[in-house]
């Protein structure tokens, strides 16, 4: 076999076998001794085609080349006398091979040689050795009828002397080559074995690295592997946090994010911090994930905002870059609004109202008090002193679509539009204040009355939107207004401790108002002609803050750093990102990637999961639509029922008057009967209307209950 390359040269005509089994002649174009293969070419359909063939396949299909080489001593043994060799009739080997397909004939491009040759090679390695090779050589010797010459004599013979007998020996010789287990492996098989060995070595190295890392970290610590990945990632980034010395920037819409430190409950559970704030406008969320094979990895998602505050930032730092620039706006006759948004327990009330100690609050260290102090400082300056401005404050909350005055014993208020299409909060009390201390007293009074509830993240969560307004009036006329809003937590209804109707209605109203608020802020930032402020009570009350050229808004997104709150943190950041949609590229250098993973992701499995999630979201969206429709119908019918009830109550003094009439000794009976009939007619109408509204309200409540059960069952199946 070693001398076979010496007998192969360019231009030599040999037989080859195609991938479809067809055998035909082809000319050798090149001989590659290093790869142990030859390149052949042939003409087919007017096109020149070619492929590469291993030396082993050349020898198998062209046995006459092997006969010219020195034979093994076993091949020279004499034939046994009792063995009869049947005479084989000459026949064409091609007769049993199917004709090539039309698609193969019409291909004009050069054929790829790898799949054709390697399939046979892999099959040959799996076969066992059969005693066919010896028989085939014996048949060849008998057929020639000549004794085997020595090698020197055979080297001078031309190939044409043995070409006639070669055609009959194609199939036996092919079997001989197939049955040889010591056959040389192809190049691709060798490469595959090398790749396999490299994979095994890499797995062994990774296993050793994991063992070493496990020794460095406390394995009993929950999520220690994710903690190690986050620590390794943070080493690669440079941190430049925001400080009081950094310059402020003016934005019509300013979107900021604030990260709070881990609280006592999270530290007790040994939770890890999954938020990194490397610069004044950039934030990373290290989302823990698992592959299909349960391999842990991180998906580091980047978000860019106007300002990003880490856990070391104080309320003073946050106020300086968020609400303080807005105070100047109201003295210039504008409307300013500052929102605190986020999950319950993320620090919204702490940021807006001040430090919390149990149920008591130090309101002097919140944005409410800081803004009021700056208002009085600016009011005392000479440029604004001549305006003779008076400072008024209001404090109210919006709970379940209803407005309550926190400074007037939580009286219920009505939101109506006047003839000038201006939204008026009927019954809201405005209180004149002369200094910042008066404001702090009002804040303490209103904060004590605010509605709270229990949620997944906070046992004493604010379940209402609290709006504290500072109004500047000049001779009774509104000059400017600053609205500071502490929004309710953005948990879903399924995340609350109780799943009763009140909780569901509460969560649905919160989500509805938050979506409406986002669209109003986006319309303000994009200078749209239409602002959808009628979608919720919150945006109705703050309507004048979203219209006009001199309107400015700031949103502070509050996030929790714990790994258990990662999903809610991402929801908060996506909501805030949709408000302004800043690109994270602006806060990153060219060398820093947007998303980094510690392990390779499985593209196929991710694609499948995305498709499944999309289908599940479609099913949930239809059920959510039915639920929201039922909730809207309940609120509408509830308002109608309250109106009918008020009408009935207003008729109460009329019945009392009739009763007092009968106490007089000389009352007119005719007058009594007429008034009683009139009152009964009016009351009957109101009672009938109230009865119909109550029936419709009962049906709407049943539909809401059914839609809620369908959503919960769907979530449990997921």
Swiss-Prot record:
Effect of residue 186 to E: Altered localization, reduced microtubule depolymerizing activity and increased frequency of prometaphase figures
Effect on the protein of changing residue 92 to A: Increased frequency of metaphase figures
Gene Ontology CC entries for this record: cytoplasm; glutamatergic synapse; kinetochore; microtubule plus-end; midbody; nucleus; postsynapse; presynapse
Modification after translation: Phosphorylation by AURKB, regulates association with centromeres and kinetochores and the microtubule depolymerization activity. Ubiquitinated.
Annotated ATP binding sites: 258, 342-349
Transmembrane segments: none
Localization per Swiss-Prot or TrEMBL: Cytoplasm, Cytoskeleton; Nucleus; Chromosome, Centromere; Chromosome, Centromere, Kinetochore
Coiled coil: 613-651, 689-716
Motif (Microtubule tip localization signal): 95-98
Principal subcellular localization: cytoplasm
Gene Ontology molecular-function annotations: ATP binding; microtubule motor activity; microtubule plus-end binding
Listed name of the protein: Kinesin-like protein KIF2C
Gene designation per UniProt: KIF2C
């Amino acid at each position: 076999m070693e001398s076979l390359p010496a007998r192969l040269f360019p231009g030599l005509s040999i037989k080859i076998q195609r991938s479809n089994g067809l055998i035909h002649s082809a000319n050798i174009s090149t001989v590659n001794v290093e790869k142990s293969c030859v390149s052949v070419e042939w003409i087919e359909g007017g096109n020149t085609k070619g492929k590469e063939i291993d030396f082993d396949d050349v020898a198998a299909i062209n046995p006459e080349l092997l006969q010219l080489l020195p034979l093994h001593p076993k091949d020279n043994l004499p034939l046994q006398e009792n063995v009869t060799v049947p005479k084989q009739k000459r026949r064409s080997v091609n007769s049993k091979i199917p004709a090539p397909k039309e698609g193969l004939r019409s291909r004009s491009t050069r054929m790829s040689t790898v799949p054709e040759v390697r399939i046979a090679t892999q099959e040959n390695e799996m076969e066992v050795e059969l005693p066919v090779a010896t028989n085939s050589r014996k048949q060849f010797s008998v057929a020639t009828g000549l004794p085997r010459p020595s090698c020197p004599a055979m080297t001078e013979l031309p190939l044409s002397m043995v070409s006639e007998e070669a055609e009959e020996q194609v199939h036996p010789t092919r079997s001989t080559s197939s049955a040889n287990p010591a056959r040389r492996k192809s190049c691709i098989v060798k490469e595959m074995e090398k790749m396999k060995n490299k994979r095994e070595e890499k797995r062994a190295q990774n296993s050793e690295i994991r063992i070493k890392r496990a020794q460095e970290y406390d394995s009993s610590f929950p999520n220690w592997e994710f903690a190690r990945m986050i620590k390794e990632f943070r080493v690669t980034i440079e941190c430049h946090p925001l400080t009081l010395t950094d310059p402020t920037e003016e934005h019509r819409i300013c979107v900021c994010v604030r990260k709070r430190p881990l609280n006592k409950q999270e530290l007790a559970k040994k939770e890890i911090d999954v938020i990194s704030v490397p610069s004044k406008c950039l934030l990373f969320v290290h989302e823990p994930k698992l592959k299909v094979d349960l391999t842990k990895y991180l998906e580091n998602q980047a978000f860019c905002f106007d300002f990003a505050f880490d856990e070391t930032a104080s309320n003073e730092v946050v106020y300086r870059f968020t609400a303080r620039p807005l105070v100047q706006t109201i003295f210039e006759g504008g409307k300013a609004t500052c929102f605190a948004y986020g999950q319950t327990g993320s620090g919204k009330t702490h940021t807006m109202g001040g430090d919390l100690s149990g149920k008591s609050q130090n309101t002097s260290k919140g944005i409410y008090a800081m803004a009021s102090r700056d208002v009085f400082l600016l009011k005392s300056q000479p440029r604004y002193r001549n305006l003779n401005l008076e400072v008024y404050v209001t404090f109210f909350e919006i709970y379940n679509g209803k407005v309550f005055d926190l400074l007037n014993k939580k009286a219920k208020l009505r939101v109506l539009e006047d003839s000038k299409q201006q939204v008026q909060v009927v019954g809201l009390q405005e209180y004149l204040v002369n200094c910042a201390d008066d404001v702090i007293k009002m804040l303490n009074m209103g904060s004590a009355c605010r509605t709270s509830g229990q949620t997944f993240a906070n046992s004493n969560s604010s379940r209402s939107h609290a709006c504290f307004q500072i109004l500047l009036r000049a001779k009774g006329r509104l000059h400017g207004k600053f609205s500071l809003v502490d929004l309710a937590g953005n948990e879903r209804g399924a995340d609350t401790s109780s799943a009763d109707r009140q909780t569901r209605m509460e969560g649905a109203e919160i989500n509805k108002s938050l979506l409406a608020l986002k669209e109003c802020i986006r319309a303000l930032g994009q200078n749209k002609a239409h602002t959808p402020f009628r979608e919720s009570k919150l945006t109705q009350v703050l309507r004048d803050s979203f219209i006009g050229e001199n309107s400015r808004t700031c949103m502070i997104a509050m996030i929790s750093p714990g790994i258990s709150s990662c999903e809610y943190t991402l929801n908060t950041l996506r909501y805030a990102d949709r408000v302004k949609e800043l690109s994270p590229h602006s806060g990153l250098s060219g060398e820093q990637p947007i998303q980094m993973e510690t392990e390779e992701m499985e593209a196929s499995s991710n694609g499948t999961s995305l498709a499944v999630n999309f289908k599940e979201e479609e099913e949930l969206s239809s059920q959510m639509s039915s639920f929201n429709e039922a909730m809207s119908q309940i609120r509408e019918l509830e308002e109608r029922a309250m109106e009918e009830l008020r009408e009935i109550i207003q008729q109460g003094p009329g019945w009392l008057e009739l009763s007092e009439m009968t106490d007089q000794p000389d009352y007119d009976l005719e007058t009594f009967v007429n008034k009683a009939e009139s009152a009964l007619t009016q009351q009957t109408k109101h009672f009938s209307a109230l009865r119909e509204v109550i029936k419709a309200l009962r049906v709407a409540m049943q539909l809401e209950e059914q839609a809620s059960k369908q959503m919960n069952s769907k979530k449990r199946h997921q």
